[in-house]
């Protein structure tokens, strides 16, 4: 009977170590993402504050697997240098949260096909040139009608 208990304990230990090893390998393979945000305002403007809340939620959910770089109070028409700054910092994704940023962001996206760019509320993703790394998005826009 002692032999059965010993064999059972050894099997449990081996399985535990194997499980831990698989978990460690899986965690090491997870990609660390760097996301850049450009906002037209700051936390005192409701429009920008909603994006800040979304960014904070993403940081909370993904923890140390995501790094966020944020630039506030960028006027439309002055976004190009800030986009370049985020590219130079090595951002994998860049979210420029103002409708007026659209044309400038698309021009930069054309130069950097390995970086994903998104302009919430934008409308030019499907106009020429259509780029695989440039996106527009809307939230649940119907809610504004009520």
Please identify what each model-predicted range represents.
Residues 1-24:
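Secretory targeting signatures
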Residues 25-34:
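Immediate post-signal peptide segment of exported/extracytoplasmic ligand-binding proteins
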Residues 34-62, 69-79, 98-101:
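Extracytoplasmic "Venus flytrap"
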Residues 37-38, 91-99, 116-120:
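Periplasmic-binding protein-like
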Residues 76-91:
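Short, well-structured alpha-helical segments in soluble
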Residues 97-111:
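Hydrophobic alpha-helical
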Residues 110-136:
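Flexible loop/hinge segments that line or gate small-molecule binding clefts
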Residues 134-146:
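Hydrophobic alpha-helical segments within soluble ligand-binding/sensing domains
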């Amino acid at each position: 009977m002692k032999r059965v208990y010993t064999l059972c304990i050894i099997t449990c230990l081996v399985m535990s170590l194997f499980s831990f090893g698989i978990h460690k390998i899986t965690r090491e393979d997870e990609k660390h993402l760097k996301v850049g945000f450009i906002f037209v305002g700051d936390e005192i403007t409701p429009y920008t504050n909603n994006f800040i809340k979304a960014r904070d939620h993403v940081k909370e959910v993904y923890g140390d697997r995501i790094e966020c770089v944020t630039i506030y109070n960028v006027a439309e028409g002055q976004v190009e240098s800030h986009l370049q700054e985020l590219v130079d910092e090595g951002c994998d994704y860049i979210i420029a949260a103002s409708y007026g940023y659209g044309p400038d962001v698309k021009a930069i996206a054309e130069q950097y096909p390995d970086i994903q760019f998104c302009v919430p509320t934008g409308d030019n993703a499907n106009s020429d040139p259509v780029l695989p790394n440039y996106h527009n998005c809307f939230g649940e826009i119907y809610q504004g009608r009520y």
